[in-house]
UniProtKB/Swiss-Prot annotation:
The record marks 217 as: Important for catalytic activity. Catalyzes the reversible phosphorolytic breakdown of the N-glycosidic bond in the beta-(deoxy)ribonucleoside molecules, with the formation of the corresponding free purine bases and pentose-1-phosphate. GO terms for molecular function: purine-nucleoside phosphorylase activity. Its EC number is 2.4.2.1. This is Purine nucleoside phosphorylase DeoD-type. Gene3D superfamilies: Nucleoside phosphorylase domain. One of its GO terms (biological process) is purine nucleoside catabolic process. The gene is deoD. Transmembrane segments: none annotated. One of its GO terms (cellular component) is cytosol. Belongs to the PNP/UDP phosphorylase family. The lineage of its organism: Bacteria, Bacillati, Bacillota, Clostridia, Thermoanaerobacterales. It is an enzyme of class 2 (transferase). A purine D-ribonucleoside binds at residues 4, 179-181, 203-204.
């Protein structure tokens, strides 16, 4: 048992899916996993372990932002021996050719967070995905008839930015989309020598102002989840 995860040794699989929303973790466990058992309810951040096509897989909610996901990733790796971490979540498109409900695979993650500046004594670090997981996810998506967008994303600390046009600078440099966790995930995976990948579904577009409803997100984001489960 760790501070924020109430699981016993052996309760968590070596591969863990990481939705930000704990209710999405519960939904995945109840609808896509066989023989799913809840191992964590601490702070309402549900965690489940079950089986997908015979493979043992866990799914653990992380909350929003780099500090929150960093807590769970640290504990999953150091206390429970997790080897593969796959974030599944939503993002906002920064490019006109990336539409709502598209799949984005994060090859790397730029960030406006200071967390790596602190860790690396003021220097920059380039948080990068596991190539092994990235290739598997890309190939599986194509096999499923999906053409994912692959590239650099932005991990931001600010959901409500004081400058609503600040995203345009990142877009100018080819950043595909914005979310709030991946730079933290990839950095910790590198620190501990494990594999990590982020697969995202576009929930809204900063370019066009389009957005999906909560109901649409629940229905249309299953492609992302199925890609993650297939490569688990």
């Amino acid at each position: 048992m760790s501070i924020h995860i109430g699981a016993k040794e052996g309760d968590i699989a070596e591969t863990v899916l990481l939705p930000g929303d704990p209710l999405r973790a519960k939904y995945i466990a109840e609808n896509l996993l066989e023989d799913a058992k809840c191992y964590n309810e601490v702070r309402g951040m549900y965690g489940f372990t079950g089986y997908y096509k015979g493979k043992r897989v866990s799914v653990q909610g992380t909350g929003m932002g780099v500090p929150s996901i960093s807590i769970y990733v640290n504990e999953l790796i150091t206390s429970y021996g997790v080897k593969n971490l796959i974030r599944i979540g939503t993002c906002g498109s920064l490019q006109p050719d990336i539409k709502i409900r598209d799949i984005v695979i994060a090859m790397s993650a730029s960030t406006d967070s200071a967390i790596n500046k602190i860790r690396f004594n003021g220097m920059d670090y380039a948080p990068t995905a596991s190539f092994k997981l990235l290739k598997k996810a890309y190939d599986k998506a194509v096999e499923m008839g999906i053409e994912p967008k692959v590239g650099n994303i932005l991990t931001t600390d600010t959901f409500y930015h004081d400058d609503p046009e600040s995203w345009r600078l990142w877009a100018k440099f080819g950043v595909l989309a914005v979310e709030m966790e991946t730079a933290g995930l990839y950095t910790l995976a590198a620190k501990y020598g494990v594999d990590a990948l982020t697969i995202l579904t576009v929930s809204d577009s900063l370019v066009t102002g389009e957005a999906t409803s909560a109901e649409e997100r629940q229905k249309t984001f299953m492609d992302m989840v199925k890609i993650a489960l297939e490569i688990a």
